Amino acid sequence: KIQHIEDIKKIRNIEKTVKGISNIPLFDISTWNSGEQYKHEIMKKYHTPSVDCIQDYKYSYEINNNIKEKIIKKIGVDDEKKCVIFPSSTTAICCICDYLKKNNYDKICILEPSYFSVAPCLDSFGVSYYKEYISLDENGIPIIPFSSIVNNKYNAVWITSPIFSTGIYYERQNLCLLKKLNQKGIFLIIDESISSPNKYIANTFQENTISIISPPKYIGINSQKFSAVICDYPLEQFLFDWIDVFCG
């Protein structure tokens, strides 16, 4: 069982009980959906092309390269980087966990707090991981456990930006430390799925890095969301081979 989901089930049962007693519906503070006013305003500016055919398969790996190049340019990463489109961030996480397993990354560090599906996905693929915890200084600036990561000799670090459930982004001094980890040969997986586009940190690192972004999620467009994985050529080829297995 996934503890996070079990906890949500308990909360939902409590909500039902309270509603049954008071007959007052509770406000769902964990919903991903936007308010009605925001939806109304965003639809004034959001236009999508009409669908010309609903019968044929449309595979994500058949998306025009021009579109992927525009995404790469928008993020500001090196032109040599590649872009692989996934239906969602969670499916991207699954494929990345599979990559870690198949390429012998056997000591993963998850910087906590992280998205709830990361640890269960690593578990399901049989990838060993350990958790290191971010703290905040007196000014609210994140403190990365740099020495612990180096001393424990992790070969990959899973980072969530902004720090999950906090809205706190990494400061310049944090990025310098992450860059040092990268220069030591540590593979960085950066989940920027709910990051503001002007706060992406993928362009801080040149190689041995993978970044997950999901631009529609940031502005609350959840019914047509996608996830883009920014990576180097060898990893792109791996994901192309396996995306059809996991995503259909």
Regions found by a protein language model. Give the residues of each.
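Short, conserved active-site loop motifs that form the nucleotide-linked donor/cofactor pocket
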Residues: 83, 186, 209
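PLP-dependent aminotransferase class I/II
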Residues: 212-248
